[in-house]
Amino acid sequence: MSYTIQFLPEATDDLTEILGWYKEQPVTDLQKKFITAISTTFKTLEKSPKSYALRFKNVRCAIVKKYPYLIYYWLDDASTTINIVAILHQSRHPKNWKKRI
């Protein structure tokens, strides 16, 4: 069963901020490589959303491979929806996204 991904507005803002930061870096194609990595993570989520561990109550956390970012999300099994709560750097404190739930 495949799930559909929905982003909270704040998660969209997180992603926009991250992409902007990578675009400004002097390394060639860094933003493009990040987009590829996070897109791969989203595809995995759609196919196997329960493959990632629960971090807090009903919130799961997916790691973006090769990048220091975590995707926080919760599932709505009834509507087969993945609700992306936040996309944050691993060094950020959980309080930064917990208030979004």
Regions found by a protein language model. Name each.
Residues 16-19, 39-46:
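Structural signal for well-ordered, non-membrane alpha-helices
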